[in-house]
Amino acid sequence: MAKIAGVVDVGGPRADGWLVVMGTGKLWLVDPLGAATPYPGTYGDATTAEPYLTVVPQLPHAVLTSSAGCSFQRGDVYVLRLHAPLGLNRVDAQGQKSAFANIPNVTNLTGIAFDTGGAFGYRVLVTGTAGAGKSEVAAIDCAGTVSVITRSAPTVEGGLEVAPPSFGAFAGTLIAPDELSGNIYAIGADGTSRAVAASGLPKGSDIGVEAVGFVPHGWHGSVYYADRVTKGNPHPGTDNLLALTSDSLAGLGVQEGDLLSATEGGATLIDVRCTTTCTVQPIITSATKAHGEGHLIFTGATPIEPSPSPRASAQPATSGRTGDAPTVFLVAAVTAGLVVIVLAVLLVLRDLRAQGRG
């Protein structure tokens, strides 16, 4: 996996299997083999801040056009704008940047996610600081209209995600971590907040839980987490994307629909499973020198709905193609075997003819 200076978040994957990565105020694309290339266009923003991002996923056909008379375009990137006026920037697949929405009455923006469940109207969800110990949650539709869900949610920051239907009483809520308390919270579309679990991991500024992510349906790939270089910190980071495979986590008891949560300091990891009750299982408890930031992003999920018809693309091979490699090798091996058999038969026939002439 290529190094990306100042890597602070990762999003996607896009329809082509590529990840979108933010580093030092610039966007990058990372292909399924780990090679990084600059994102099209000239996007640039604050180089030392934490401009988290979200990539528009595949949406149900029924909601492609909203009541606002527009639609979110799959693969578009929405990035926190952390300078005045605070808000969101939109970057399309061609790299065109536009100011999408301003979010007033907050002093900072701390997290972003896309509502994949629909309880929030399939909108972009953003958290911001609304006062001492309080967060605002705002929902932004495809027209850039900002609606405040609540201004009294707990302090939260980092990689957020909406819970799937299988996540017990918290299904459809916005799941958000708080590094200071070490707690993981669920924020509902009605503005109410509840604690999902205490992480049991080290807590504090630049230490506690930073990211959450749900193990997707039919997962057979990897989960990625940005490891940012942070000089002078006990967890100095490497500017790489950290990765764990589905096989390695399945061997530790992680299942489809579970919530994973990772810390900022050391990238320790827990598994949270909620049905009628929630249980917390430590997965990685020994802190490393990693300095985690942003989202936990999974590749290699099996779509629940049929994917859109593939379109011609100038991009290199997608993750789906890399997954076909064993089939390619099998066909090659069978073909080689048949060639050997045919050659052997020809040699035998030649010898028999020679004996007949003798």
Give the residues covered by each predicted segment.
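Intrinsically disordered, low-complexity regions enriched in serine, threonine, proline
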Residues: 308, 318, 347-350
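Intrinsically disordered, low-complexity Ser/Thr/Pro-rich tracts
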Residues: 306-316, 355-358
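C-terminal membrane-anchoring or membrane-association module
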Residues: 335-358
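Sequence-pattern detector for short linear motifs
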Residues: 93, 314, 324, 353-356
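Sequence/structural signature of beta-propeller domains
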Residues: 1-308, 312
